[in-house]
Amino acid sequence: MAGARGYRSYRGRGSKGKIILAVILVLVIVASLAFIRMQEYVVYDESGRPRLSLPGESAEQTPPEEEEDVNLVIQEKTSKTVRAMQLSTAPLTVWDGAVLTGGTYTDQTCDAVAVTMKDAAGHVYFDAAGAVSGAVRTEAGTAAALEALNAADTHTIAILSCFHDPLAANADVEGMGLKNTGGYIFYDGSNSQWLDPAKPAARQYLCALAEELAKLGFDEILLTDVSYPTEGKLDKIAYGTTPRAENLAAFLDEMAAALEPYDVTLSVELPAQVITQGSDDAAGLSLADTAQRADRIYAAAAPADAAALADQVEAAAEGTDFAVMLTAADTPPQEGSWLLPAQS
């Protein structure tokens, strides 16, 4: 039945209002998301004012902080040329600089003196705290003579025999001695004994002696017998697992580290054939490995061969000096470093 005249039943709000509300809600959501998204592209200038930096726009790069200048100091080998005279192997009891005037050898004046501080028998010719028992051989005036020597205006060279050392090898066979494959001390072709370069205690023994010499004031330390034995039943030597050349290189590295606090030249004697051939596998010697770790290389050779040997040393390690070790009958070369033998 129809309703009363003039009235209609109420049907609620129209659908148009709902649509408007939905549109407004969507716009609010989109605006919020856009605001959040745009925060990623807001940057601030030096005054703190914000600005918009959109993708693809060339953003102003912040200038990098100025780096302080770094002065890189590279210490080059600066070994000067030396013309040295070697004194007799014995405890030094007196020092007289007049011995360097040349004597019977040459009309050239020597400017350096070499003194044996440890020989190939293991004898130590100074009051070394670290020497094995019975190795030290000194006289009453030795300490005073060494002090006077190193106080003089003369380049002083301490000769230190290294691994050929029967005294130290027998004093501590297990810790320092070179052994044979049977587990006993090795005897070379001259019935002598050696320290084992593979054993840290043997290397440390030599480094400690060298450091004592540096403390005495020597300007240069010349290492001799830096090798394995090359005579005798070499196939009976218990070399261990580390290559011989690596053991000797490790020794020279440790020696350099021990002497680093002191202003001292580190020198090594090599056989001349190691310089000409480049290596000696039996001895464990490599010219390159040795020359790169030393300031000066010494080798016994004729004066006429000195220049060629010096060139080969220089080629192996730029800046490493070469000194020829002469005989009593030799006339020293006019150029380069050399070492005269002890006067008889």
Give, region by region, the residue ranges found by the protein language model.
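Glycine-rich, aromatic-flanked loop segments that form ligand/cofactor-binding clefts
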Residues: A112, T138-F186
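Aromatic-lined carbohydrate-recognition surfaces of secreted/lumenal glycan-active proteins
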Residues: H155-H164, L222-L223, A245-A283, A317-D330
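N-terminal Lys/Arg-rich, disordered targeting/topogenic segments
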Residues: M1-G17
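Catalytic domains of carbohydrate-active enzymes, especially glycoside hydrolases
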Residues: A98-V124, E212-L222, A288-Y298
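Active-site-adjacent "subsite" loops/lids of carbohydrate-active enzymes
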Residues: V73-L92, F163-E211
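Hydrophobic membrane-insertion alpha-helices, especially the h-region
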Residues: I20-R37
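Aromatic-lined substrate-binding rim segments of carbohydrate-active enzymes
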Residues: E68, G102, D119-S161, E231-L266
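Substrate-binding cleft of secreted/luminal carbohydrate-active enzymes
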Residues: R37-V43, R293-S344
